[in-house]
Amino acid sequence: SSLEEQLAQQKRDYAALQQSLDKSLLNTNSNNINISKLVDQINESNQYIRHLVEVKSKSDSLNMVLSNNLTRSLSREELKEVDVQVLKGVVYISLADNMLYKSGSYEINDRAAETLSKIAKIIMDYKDYDVLIEGNTDDVPVNPTSPLMKNIRNNWDLSALRASSVVQYLQNNYGVDPKRLTAGGRGEYNPITSNSTELGKQRNRRTQIIITPKLDQFMELIDKAPENGSAQQ
């Protein structure tokens, strides 16, 4: 459950509690509703909503600062091959494969080092965030005759190996805590455009560095949600 969904649910619960209170005040002969208890529940729900709004606002602000700091650190040339976006509370850094990897390989290209060092600095600065490295390919099958593709069966393997290369590069070269890193491959099954043109294929061949607030923080928030179901009578 996302923070936005949790906030929306709490607002619905709050409205239901308020409605119950209004009904009970109109029907003073009703003995099955404890008005003072209902007021307490409304106050608790309202306090929790305010807390969620504060957390979401802080998270959104940190994401924008993170995104802006990274964008400012990148050169004009780098920005042609690196796309930084904030979507639904998550920072997405999309890197073009022709910049990141040696041609037809999953080994990191030397010219990617400077860009990755800037991304690593941002990751190190924001220690309360987890980092998912996600590899994506176009729909062209792997060439099994290429010596660089030895033992690579398909685009699943290639995308996962490329993501793993970035993870290990960040860990080994820049000291990023490996406990914060996850490598994943999505093969050809997460395209952002059609593979019918060369330009489309090029856009789909990308690696995304996805920076998210640690999940356990949000699970703790959800666990603290007030139980209002009993009030909706």
Each model region followed by its residue ranges:
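Extracellular/lumenal/periplasmic "stalk" regions immediately C-terminal to a signal peptide or transmembrane helix
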Residues: S1-Q85
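Periplasmic OmpA-like peptidoglycan-binding domain that tethers envelope proteins to the cell wall
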Residues: L100-E114, K118, Y126, N136-Q232
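Sec-exported extracytoplasmic/periplasmic mature domains
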Residues: Q47, E54-S57, S75, K121-D128, ...
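Short Gly/Ser/Thr- and Asp/Glu-enriched loop/turn motifs at secondary-structure junctions
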Residues: V86-V90
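Short, aliphatic-rich beta-strand segments
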Residues: V91-A96
